[in-house]
Curated annotation (Swiss-Prot):
GO molecular function: acetylglutamate kinase activity; ATP binding
Highest taxon of source: Bacteria
Physiological role: Catalyzes the ATP-dependent phosphorylation of N-acetyl-L-glutamate.
Biological or metabolic pathway of the protein: Amino-acid biosynthesis; L-arginine biosynthesis; N(2)-acetyl-L-ornithine from L-glutamate: step 2/4
Ligand binding (substrate): 46-47, 68, 160
The protein's name: Acetylglutamate kinase
InterPro entries: AceGlu_kinase-like_sf (IPR036393), AcgluKinase_fam (IPR004662), ArgB (IPR037528), Asp/Glu/Uridylate_kinase (IPR001048)
Length: 260
């Protein structure tokens, strides 16, 4: 594992795809980092596009404890929305910012091992790091991998993986520093104020109180898992906030620090 955190793993949520200005700003930030020799790996979701595509095909979106339920008949549509449309929208924004990128999925390069997470969720996967050679080769060229959260089991079955968990596995694989970027500035308390730092006990208390729930619960628990595994803080921050992106480019702490 790298000890100098030379790879910055940026996980972006699906809401970014609906904000051209946000995408442009984030890609400009990434371009500046790459120009300074900072290796950047981007992992993305695309929930809003998935919802749109399912609705267009007369299918319903169902979630269980913040995770998307993926029946087999929905898998081709979900894979198309995430590994196809969402990935290429982000790659287009990267190209516009002058970034050389590689669009990929978790299924590429023997990068992760995937299995069914929970039968109740259908074709939802859980991934563990496997082989970092493919990613490390791309990063060594100064290119930016843009990875969707579609994985594949050994039998060729596609799986839909929560993008926060996907980013966690890839951060472990490359020994990188993980930043979970969404449309909120970090974890908020019951009064809507930013919490600058959280540890495992504080997270458990806030989950019990219902302050951290649904998608943010999944996000924070993924961040805590990788923070504990790597022995360093994981950041939960916003792509909407220009000042946070500038600070991020300088290597400063932004948003909420999830402590190991």
């Amino acid at each position: 594992m790298s000890t100098n955190n030379s790879v910055l793993v940026l996980k972006v949520g699906g809401a970014l795809l609906q904000c051209e200005m946000g995408m442009a700003r984030l890609m400009d930030t990434a371009a500046a980092m790459l120009a300074n020799g900072q290796q950047v790996l981007m992992v993305h979701g695309g929930g809003c596009l998935v919802d749109e595509q399912l609705a267009a095909n007369g299918m319903e979106t169902v979630k269980l404890e913040g995770l998307r339920v993926t029946p087999p008949e929905q898998m081709p549509i979900i894979a198309g929305a995430l590994a196809g449309t969402s990935n290429k929208i982000l790659q287009g924004a990267a190209t516009k910012a002058g970034i050389v990128s590689v669009g990929m999925s978790l299924a590429d390069g023997n990068t992760v091992s995937a299995k069914i997470k929970d039968e109740r969720l259908g074709l939802v996967g859980e991934v563990t790091p496997k082989d970092g050679a493919y990613l490390k080769f791309i990063l060594a060229q100064g290119w930016m991998p843009i990875c969707s959260s579609i994985a594949m089991m050994d039998d060729g079955q596609m799986l839909n993986v929560n993008a926060d968990q996907a980013a966690t596995a890839l951060a472990k694989l490359v020994g990188g520093k993980l930043v979970l970027l969404s449309d909120v500035s970090g974890v908020l308390d019951g009064k809507g104020q930013l919490i600058h730092s959280l540890n495992g006990k504080q997270i458990a208390d806030l989950v019990k109180q219902g302050v951290i729930e649904k998608g943010m619960k999944v996000k924070v628990e993924a961040a805590l898992e990788v923070a504990q595994w790597m022995g360093q803080a994981v950041q939960v921050a916003s792509w909407r906030d220009a000042s946070q992106l500038i600070a991020l480019a300088k290597g400063e702490a932004v948003g909420t620090q999830i402590q190991p």
